[in-house]
């Protein structure tokens, strides 16, 4: 299972791929959310609001298991608080 840092920018994945969100911030939970009306690229949650919470780092980074949907395309999402690398983020599913 691949690790994806919540504040990283663009990344690639394979349809249906399992991965783990990783949050290195020791002060804030990370919130992954839908970018406007763009399609949601993850299998959970299955209904709005499309948000995921990755816990903050305590003794080790916060993590959350996740999975990409089965439709190849370029998708956009927002992760906060990750202002230094900007939003929206991009995942390309092949």
Please describe what each predicted stretch is:
Residues 1-6, 45, 51, 55-56:
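Right-handed parallel beta-helix/beta-solenoid
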Residues 1-3, 29, 88-90:
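Low-complexity, intrinsically disordered short peptide segments enriched in small/polar/basic residues
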Residues 22-25:
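Asparagine-centered strand-capping/turn motif at beta-strand->loop junctions
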Residues 29-42:
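Short, surface-exposed beta-strand/strand-loop-strand elements in extracellular ectodomains
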Residues 17, 27-31, 73:
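Short beta-strand/loop motifs in extracellular/secreted proteins, especially
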């Amino acid at each position: 299972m691949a690790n994806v840092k919540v504040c990283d920018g663009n990344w690639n994945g394979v349809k249906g791929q399992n991965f783990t969100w990783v949050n290195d911030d020791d002060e804030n939970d990370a919130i992954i959310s839908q970018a406007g009306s763009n399609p949601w690229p993850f299998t959970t949650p299955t209904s709005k609001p499309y948000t995921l919470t990755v816990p903050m780092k305590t003794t080790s980074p916060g993590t959350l298991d996740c999975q990409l949907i089965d439709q190849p395309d370029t998708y956009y999402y927002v992760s906060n608080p990750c202002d230094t690398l900007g939003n929206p983020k991009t995942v390309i599913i092949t």
